[in-house]
């Protein structure tokens, strides 16, 4: 067969693909929704942890930023 790829190679490729999808899509999307819910009520330590995760997941945040747009909530006057 021309496409006789060893099982170990397929396993490693699947592992790399799943880790990259998790790092670039799943974790940043979860962080976006968490930040949207907790931004105005977070304590100082929680805000520091949020800033760390934004720094850590920055490539995924850049990848998702054109599609997710969370504007501030409308104020009741």
UniProtKB/Swiss-Prot annotation:
Keywords attached to this entry: Membrane, NAD, NADP, Plastoquinone, Quinone, Thylakoid, Translocase, Transmembrane, Transmembrane helix, Transport
**Which reaction is this enzyme known to catalyze?**
a plastoquinone + NADH + (n+1) H(+)(in) = a plastoquinol + NAD(+) + n H(+)(out); a plastoquinone + NADPH + (n+1) H(+)(in) = a plastoquinol + NADP(+) + n H(+)(out)
- What's the main place this protein lives? membrane
Q: Return the InterPro entries for the record.
A: NADH-quinone_OxRdatse_su_L (IPR019654)
Q: What is its EC number?
A: 7.1.1.-
Annotated localization: Cellular thylakoid membrane
Q: Which GO terms describe its molecular function?
A: oxidoreductase activity, acting on NAD(P)H, quinone or similar compound as acceptor; quinone binding
Here the disulfide bonds are none
Q: How does it assemble?
A: NDH-1 can be composed of about 15 different subunits; different subcomplexes with different compositions have been identified which probably have different functions.
This one is known as: NAD(P)H-quinone oxidoreductase subunit L
Q: Which organism is it from?
A: Picosynechococcus sp. (strain ATCC 27264 / PCC 7002 / PR-6) (Agmenellum quadruplicatum)
């Amino acid at each position: 067969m021309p496409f006789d790829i060893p099982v170990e190679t397929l396993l490693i490729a699947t592992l790399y693909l799943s880790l990259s999808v998790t790092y670039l899509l799943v974790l940043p999307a979860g962080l976006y929704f968490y930040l949207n819910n907790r931004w105005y009520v977070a304590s100082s330590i929680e805000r520091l942890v949020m800033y760390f995760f934004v720094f850590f997941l920055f490539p995924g945040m850049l990848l998702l930023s054109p599609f997710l747009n969370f504007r501030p909530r409308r104020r009741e006057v």
